[in-house]
């Protein structure tokens, strides 16, 4: 028997012990370490989708496929940079959902970290201007 999106989310949050909110459109929201907000939704009861705002200071990335499967795509929504990903609900179990969510959160953290260190010169290494 196929697990519904609602059942999958209930199992996930119970397993992870995370506090979450769900709105009237069945969009689940939770925070990671107080600085990353992740939204999880299901499109037409077929596609599970993950979303997170990246922050205004991150440049747009045109790498549509990325390093992960399912792909994590950086784009814009309402003028703000976001990271999103989706995969079919069919066959998605709790362990796969947890692993996907963990990779997604790791990707967000790496993108934010690389942006924070991108323009901070290391005082111990010389800067070469060409």
Swiss-Prot record:
Q: Please name the Pfam families in this protein's record.
A: CesT
Which top-rank group of organisms is this from?
A: Bacteria
| GO BP terms, alphabetized | protein secretion by the type III secretion system
Coiled-coil ranges from the UniProt annotation: none
User: InterPro entries, from UniProt?
Assistant: Tir_chaperone (IPR010261)
Keyword Transmembrane helix assigned: no
Q: Which UniProt keywords apply?
A: Chaperone, Plasmid
Keyword Chaperone assigned: yes
- Per the UniProt entry, the disulfide pairs are none
What's the subunit arrangement here? Binds to YopT.
Function of the molecule: Functions as a specific chaperone for YopT.
Q: What is this protein called?
A: Chaperone protein SycT
Origin species, per record, is: Yersinia enterocolitica serotype O:8 / biotype 1B (strain NCTC 13174 / 8081)
């Amino acid at each position: 028997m196929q697990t519904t999106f609602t059942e999958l989310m209930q199992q996930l949050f119970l397993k992870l012990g995370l506090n979450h909110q769900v709105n009237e459109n069945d969009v689940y929201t939770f925070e990671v370490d107080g600085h990353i907000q992740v939204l999880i939704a299901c499109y037409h009861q077929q596609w599970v989708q993950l979303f997170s705002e990246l922050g205004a200071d991150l440049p747009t990335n045109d790498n549509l496929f990325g390093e992960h499967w399912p792909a994590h795509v950086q784009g814009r929504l309402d003028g703000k940079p976001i990271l999103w990903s989706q995969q079919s609900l069919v066959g998605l179990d709790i362990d796969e959902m947890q692993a996907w969510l963990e990779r997604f959160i790791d990707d967000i953290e790496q993108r934010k970290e690389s942006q924070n260190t991108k323009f901070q010169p290391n005082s111990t290494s010389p800067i070469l201007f060409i």
